[in-house]
Amino acid sequence: MAMSKPEQPAHTGSGPLFERRYWVDVQHPRQPADALLRHIERHLPDFSSDLLADFEKSKGTEGRLAVGDEYSIKILGPWNGDVRVTEVGTDFFELTTLESHPEAGRIRFSLRPHATLSDTVRFEIHSWARSRDGLVAFTYDTLGLGRRVQQQTWEVFCQRVADFSGGLLLGPVQVETIKEGEEVD
C-alpha cells in the first residue's frame, strides 16, 4: 500500500495568503441542513464540475466521508492535486491540501441555518490558502489562470447544492476574496 502524502499547510506555500468565501442562501429547502450536508459528504464528486475539478476518492469507504479519507482531483490545466479530510462536524467538513497540490492550505464546506432568515440555509465554501510555489503563484495569481478556474469550480459547486436542495435560491452565488494584509474586495 502506498504511503499517504504529507499535508501541505498554508505556511509551507509561497506568496500571499488568500482567504476566499463562496456562498449561497436557499429558502425553503426540501430537507433539513444536516441531511443535505450528509448527502453532499456522501456524493462529493456529484457537486463538482468534472470538466473543472473531477473529484475521485482515493482512500476511504465510498458513500461516506470520514477523517483520513483522501480525494485525487483532476483540475483543468496542469493543476491536479490531492486533499485529505481533516475534520468532520455536524454542520461542516474540512479538506487539507496534500504535497504537490497547486495550493497549500485548507478548505471548509459548511451548511447552516441562515443567521436572520427563517427556513433558510447558507451553504458556504471557505478557504485559506497560498500557492504551492513561485511558479504556481505567478500563473495562478499574477496571470489569473488558476484563480478563474477555481472560482468557477466553487460557484458551480454552490449552484449544484442549491439546485439539489430544491429550495428557492436567494440571489447569485456570492464571492469574497481577502488577500493577506488587504481589505475585502
Pin down the residues of each PLM region.
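N-terminal leader/presequence segments that precede the conserved core
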Residues: 73-76, 181-185
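Hydrophobic-ligand binding "helix-grip"
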Residues: 74-119
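Beta-strand/loop substructures that line and gate deep hydrophobic ligand-binding cavities in soluble
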Residues: 100-148
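Conserved short hydrophobic interaction patches
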Residues: 39, 43, 47, 101, ...
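Intrinsic-disorder/low-complexity, polar/charged segments enriched in Ser/Thr/Lys/Arg/Asp/Glu/Gln
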Residues: 17-23, 92, 120-122
